[in-house]
UniProtKB/Swiss-Prot annotation:
Name of the gene this protein is made from: minC
TM region(s), chain numbering: none
Assigned protein family: Belongs to the MinC family.
Domain of life: Bacteria
Residue ranges of coiled coil: none
Annotated protein name in UniProt: Probable septum site-determining protein MinC
Function: Cell division inhibitor that blocks the formation of polar Z ring septums. Rapidly oscillates between the poles of the cell to destabilize FtsZ filaments that have formed before they mature into polar Z rings. Prevents FtsZ polymerization.
Low complexity compositional bias, start-end: 119-129
GO biological process, one term: division septum assembly
Assembly and binders: Interacts with MinD and FtsZ.
Region (Disordered): 89-130
HAMAP family cross-referenced by the UniProt entry: MinC
Keywords: Cell cycle, Cell division, Plasmid, Septation
Listed Pfam families: MinC_C
Length: 249
C-alpha cells in the first residue's frame, strides 16, 4: 500500500560560505611536506581543526600519488575537506569531493628564512608621496568588536572587515580578519590580517608576544620577530613581500 503524506512540510536548504585555507602543493612532494612541517613546528596547532582545500590544478600527479599525499596530510592533522582542480581520473571513492567555483584569494606561503640573517624589524621605508592620480576611492569597512579576552583554542574569523579585541589574545587562540586587526591587550596567539586579499591591512597590538602574524598571506613567526619588538606596543604592515614593524608611542 502506498502511504500518502498529507502533512507536507518543506525542507529548508540554505546556502552559506565559510573560510578555508587552500594548500597548493609543489613537486617534489617530500620537499613541500618538509616546508609544511616547518610551518607547523613554528606555530603549533595551526592546522588542527581547520578546514583545508587542496589545490592540485598545477600538480602533475597520478591517483596513487594523490592518495599518498592525502595520507601524509592526515598524519599531520590537516583535514582536507575538498580537492580543487583535479582531473576526474584522480578521484576514487573515499577521497574528499571535487570542488569548483572557489573565489580567488592570495596564496598562504611559508616564508624562506635564512638562520644566518638577523630578523628584520624597525621602521619601514618612508612612504612615497601620493600623487592625485594614485588616490583611490575608499569604501566603508565593516568591523566587529570583541569585548572580552580570546581564550586558548578559540578563533575569531571575520573575512568581511576589521576585528577589534578589547582584551588579550591567549596563546593558541587566533584572530582572522579580512581587514585590519586591533588588539587592546597582549597578543600571544595568532593574528591574520587581510586574509581575503587586502595588502593594505595592518595589525596593531598593545603588547606583542605573538606566535604567528600574517598580512595578505605573508607570514612571520615568533622566531622571525626582532627581540626588541617583543613586549612592546607595535603596528605591522606589508611592503612588498615583507612584513614591516614599528613601535607605537
Amino acid at each position: 500500500m502506498t502511504k500518502v503524506l498529507t502533512d507536507a512540510r518543506s525542507i529548508r536548504i540554505k546556502g552559506r560560505s565559510f573560510l578555508a585555507l587552500v594548500l597548493s602543493p609543489e613537486l617534489p612532494l617530500d620537499w613541500w611536506l618538509g616546508r609544511l612541517d616547518d610551518l607547523a613546528s613554528r606555530s603549533a596547532g595551526f592546522f588542527l581543526g581547520r578546514p583545508v582545500v587542496l589545490d592540485v590544478a598545477d600538480l602533475e600527479i597520478d591517483r596513487k600519488q594523490l592518495k599518498s599525499l592525502l595520507d601524509e596530510l592526515g598524519q599531520r592533522n590537516v583535514r582536507v575537506m575538498g580537492i580543487e582542480g583535479g582531473r576526474p581520473s584522480l578521484f576514487e571513492p573515499g577521497m574528499p569531493p571535487a570542488m569548483k567555483g572557489g573565489r580567488p584569494a592570495p596564496d598562504f606561503e611559508v616564508p624562506e628564512v635564512d638562520p644566518a640573517d638577523p630578523p628584520k624589524a624597525g621602521k619601514g621605508k618612508a612612504a612615497a608621496p601620493i600623487t592625485p592620480e594614485e588616490v583611490q576611492p575608499v569604501r566603508a569597512t565593516a568591523s566587529i568588536i570583541v569585548r572580552e579576552p580570546v581564550r586558548s583554542g578559540q578563533s575569531v574569523i571575520f573575512p568581511e572587515g576589521d576585528v577589534t579585541v578589547v582584551g588579550s589574545v591567549a596563546s593558541g587562540a587566533e584572530i582572522v580578519a579580512g581587514g585590519s586587526v586591533h588588539i587592546y591587550g597582549t597578543l600571544r596567539g595568532r593574528a591574520l590580517a587581510g586574509s581575503v586579499g587586502n595588502a593594505s591591512a595592518r595589525i596593531f597590538c598593545r603588547r606583542l608576544e605573538a606566535e604567528l602574524l600574517a598580512i595578505d598571506g605573508v607570514y612571520k613567526t615568533a622566531e622571525d620577530m626582532a627581540p626588541n619588538l617583543r613586549g612592546q606596543s607595535v603596528q605591522l604592515w606589508l611592503e612588498g613581500d615583507s612584513i614591516m614593524a614599528e613601535r607605537l608611542n
